[in-house]
Amino acid sequence: MSRVCQVTGKGPVTGNNISHANNKTRRRFLPNLQHHRFWVEEEKRFVRLRVSAKGMRIIDKRGISVVLAELRRDGKV
């Protein structure tokens, strides 16, 4: 399973670890992904999504029904 948020599309980005001696080695910054079950009142069932913390805030703000409708329209769910 890829490390991509289903709501925001956020994925890993690359950067550097930098030591005290200013040595640089490559690293990945991973999004804060969580598996979360959301209750959809219109469908009377749970929907399980892999979302970032930012994605959960978007769902809290706009509502799960609106977000799900957009994901289904775009073919992401």
Swiss-Prot record:
Any one Gene Ontology molecular-function term assigned to this protein's record: structural constituent of ribosome
Pfam families, per the entry: Ribosomal_L28 (PF00830)
Gene3D superfamilies for this protein: Ribosomal protein L28/L24
GO cellular component, one term: cytosolic large ribosomal subunit
Protein name per UniProt: Large ribosomal subunit protein bL28
Family: Belongs to the bacterial ribosomal protein bL28 family.
Annotated region described as Disordered, given as residue ranges: 1-20
Native organism: Pseudomonas fluorescens (strain Pf0-1)
Entry keywords, A to Z: Ribonucleoprotein, Ribosomal protein
GO BP terms, alphabetized: translation
